[in-house]
C-alpha cells in the first residue's frame, strides 16, 4: 500500500512524501525539507507509525525539498539510500547548506529547517539498477540525471517514484520541469525520460505532486516544455542578460502559459511554490553557459 503524505510546504499539494507499507515496517520515499518534518510525523501517525518505525529512507536526490529531513530519520535509526554523487553531501552537509544559505539568507531556516550530517554507518550509496529487497517489496534504483547528477528514480513493481525527473504537475495544471542550478543537462534529461518510458510503468508518483497514469502524454508534454523553456532561455543567454534581469519576464511567461489553460491565481501560486521561476532561470542560463564553454 502506498500512501501520499502532503507536507504542506507553503501551500497544499506542493511537496509529497510517500509511505510504503511492507512486512518489515514502513518505507519512506522522499522526506521533504526538515522544516516540514512535523507534518511528516503527523502523516505517519495517521497511518499508525512513529519516526522510529521507519528503518529505510529512499531518496531520489539530495535537494532540500526531497532530502532535507533524512538526517532526522537517521537519528531515529533509519538507513538512508542515496546516489553515490549525493552521499558525501549528506554525510557532511556543511558545504551544501552554506551554499544554499548564501541564496536564502535569513529565510534559510524558515524555508528548509536544519540539516545535520548522517553517519556513514546509516547511509548506503546506490548504483544504477541496484535492487533493495525490503519486507517483501523490491525497489529498483534507476540513475536518471538531467535535473541533477545525483538523481534516482525508484521503481516498485509497475510504479515509479520519479523525484523531479518526470517534472512537476499540480492538479489541475500541466507538467513543468524544475530546472535549478547547478546540474541541469537537457540531453541527459531527455535520455532519462526515455528510460522511464521504456520501463512501461502504470503510475508515476511525482514528489510535486502525486500520481500520474497517462504516462506517454505526460512525458511528451514534459519534453515539449523542456524544449520550449530551453530555447526561450537560450535567446536571453545570447543577449547576456542576468538571472535578475530574466526572472520577471520568465515568471510572467510561465504564468501566462498556466493562465491560458484556465488555472486560477491560487493554482499558479502552487506552481511557483513548488518550482520557483528564479531557480529555473538560474539553472537554464547556467546550462547554456556550460554548453558554450564545452
Give the ranges of each region predicted by the language model.
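Divalent metal-coordination and catalytic microenvironments
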Residues: 20, 30, 40, 61, ...
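Metallo-beta-lactamase
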Residues: 33, 53-65, 90-143, 149-216
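C-terminal regulatory/interaction regions
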Residues: 232-294
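Divalent-metal (often Zn2+) His-rich catalytic cores of metallo-beta-lactamase-fold enzymes
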Residues: 76, 190-243
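Metal-dependent catalytic neighborhoods of phosphoester/phosphodiester hydrolases
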Residues: 67-76, 92-93
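Conserved beta-strand hairpin/beta-sheet module of binuclear metal-dependent hydrolase folds
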Residues: 1-51, 154-162
